């Protein structure tokens, strides 16, 4: 079930639980976080807040459904600190899966008009790859990574800097190999990190 964070309500989750019991199937809820920067969320017209994502994730966690979070790694208004915080936020919540993708500029949208006028400066694929590597390094190791680069439909003006999706994917994997980075290799901020550092001194 793919939906928005501000559309999660206990009554809907009860329906899903009943369906799960009736049909004996696993249920995954997909939520778009996209960014932890409130100014960016306004820019792209998400009309939900980070707090609403947290609330929705906690509600879903109470029902023990799988939860897949979506993050856009190359939003022009986000910096690497925002991207790192997105990975951390996902990791402290009951998120079981993640999809990472780049910004799609769809024809006929407000973003498309801004792009065509030159009001948006998109990040190059190399920066997208750097941000994905950062996310993966900060991500909790047990979260299933379903996607690290997306493919777009024909009505898309721009995605992945015009590069083929597989080329971007291979570049990300190359960066991780060359730098000896694995998922969760920098996930050292959970479970009282400051106390652990003090105890180990």
Where are each of the predicted segments found?
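Conserved SAM/AdoMet-binding glycine-rich loop
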Residues: 1-50, 54-56, 61-62
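Short, internal active-site loops enriched in acidic
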Residues: 4-8, 76, 150-155
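Generic domain-boundary/flexible-linker signal
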Residues: 10-12, 40, 80, 109, ...
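Short glycine/serine/threonine-biased micro-segments
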Residues: 30, 72, 116
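Surface-exposed cleft-lining segments at the edges of enzyme active sites
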Residues: 39-46, 72-75, 119
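Short, solvent-exposed loop/turn segments at secondary-structure boundaries
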Residues: 43-46, 79-81, 159
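Conserved C-terminal portion of the radical SAM core fold
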Residues: 51-110, 126-151
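Auxiliary Fe-S-binding modules of radical SAM enzymes
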Residues: 97, 104-201
């Amino acid at each position: 079930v793919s939906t928005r964070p501000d559309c999660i309500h206990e009554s809907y989750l009860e329906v899903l639980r009943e369906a799960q019991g009736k049909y004996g199937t696993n249920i995954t809820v997909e939520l778009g976080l996209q960014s932890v920067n409130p100014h960016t969320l306004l820019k792209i017209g998400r009309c939900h807040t980070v707090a609403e994502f947290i609330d929705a994730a906690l509600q879903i966690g109470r029902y023990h459904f799988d939860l897949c979070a979506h993050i856009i790694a190359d939003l022009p208004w986000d910096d690497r600190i925002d991207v790192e915080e997105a990975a951390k936020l996902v990791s402290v919540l009951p998120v079981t899966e993640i999809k990472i993708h780049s910004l799609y500029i769809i024809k006929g949208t407000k973003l498309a008009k801004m792009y065509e006028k030159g009001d948006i400066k998109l990040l190059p694929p190399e920066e997208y790859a750097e941000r994905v590597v950062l996310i993966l390094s900060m991500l909790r190791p047990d979260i299933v990574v379903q996607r690290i680069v997306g493919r777009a439909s024909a009505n898309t003006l721009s995605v992945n800097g015009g590069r083929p999706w597989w080329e971007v994917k291979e570049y990300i994997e190359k960066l991780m190999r060359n730098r000896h980075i694995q998922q969760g290799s920098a996930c050292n901020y959970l479970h009282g990190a400051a106390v652990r550092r003090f105890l180990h001194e």
